[in-house]
Amino acid sequence: MRTLILSLLLLVDLTTQAATLGFPALPGGGLVYKQVQSIRERRFADLVEQKTDFSCGAAALATILEKAYGAPLDEQAVIQGMLAHADPEIVRTQGFSMLDMKRYVESMGMRARGYRIEAAQLEQLKIPAIVLMEIRGYKHFVVLQRTQGEYVYVGDPALGHKRYALTEFAKGWNGIVFAVIGQGYDRGNPLLTPPEPLTARNRLDRFKPVRDAELMEFGFIQSDFF
């Protein structure tokens, strides 16, 4: 029985980890090796996964700082940084707020901006941002990666990459986007090209570099580009 349980655990582990697998080539040939990504790894690719019930804001902010700005920060580092500017008791019961994020970002010498916009304008947003959604009665911070047509692509620290119909997203969103602005922004960061759902056939439009003028609309200044 112990051997059976161990085998099952190993099987589960293999399904959640990347592996290099060999595939038969032409008849009589050798194997062709290809790196295979597990479903879980694909789901959280380029996202910082939250580890606690209250840390969705920290994980979302860590995702943007790491993937869009190259800052070597994980969720725990961001939690510690934000706790220095927040009330620990409020955080324990309610989680972090956008104000906590703003204070932390500004302590790093960066800027934070909150914008209230209509759902129909989301496609004009050219940078990844943090938004607050209400999902099944719970308020939850996620990374708004991109809006294309009638779909919104979200990096959820708890659930991974998600795609919502724009109308569905708008029902659970409070209408505010929280943008992090500063030097070192990578215009080709992976958050702008989220993976399509595994069942989808259509791919995102080919990535187009973001122009300076588009970034400056959201608070970037010329010195941020050098």
Curated annotation (Swiss-Prot):
Which GO molecular function, any one, fits this protein according to its record?
ATP binding
InterPro entries named among the record's database cross-references: Peptidase_C39
In the UniProt record for this chain, what is stated about the effect of gene disruption?
Deletion of the entire fapA-fapF six-gene locus shows no visible growth phenotype.
Cellular component GO terms, alphabetical = membrane; periplasmic space
EC number(s)? 3.4.22.-
Enzyme kind, highest EC tier: hydrolase
Q: Which UniProt keywords apply?
A: ATP-binding, Hydrolase, Nucleotide-binding, Periplasm, Protease, Signal, Thiol protease
Catalytic site positions: C56
Q: Which Pfam families match?
A: Peptidase_C39
Q: Which residues form the Peptidase C39 domain?
A: 50-180
Task: Tell me where it resides.
Answer: Periplasm
Keyword Plastid present in the record's keywords: the answer is no
- What range does the record give for the signal peptide? 1-18
Its function, per the record, reads:
Probable protease that might be involved in processing fibril precursors. Upon overexpression of the endogenous six-gene locus (fapA-fapF), cells form large clumps during liquid growth, make large amounts of biofilm and produce amyloid fibrils.
What protein family does this chain belong to? Belongs to the FapD family.
What name is this protein filed under?
Probable functional amyloid protease FapD
Native species: Pseudomonas aeruginosa (strain ATCC 15692 / DSM 22644 / CIP 104116 / JCM 14847 / LMG 12228 / 1C / PRS 101 / PAO1)
Taxonomic lineage is: Bacteria, Pseudomonadati, Pseudomonadota, Gammaproteobacteria, Pseudomonadales
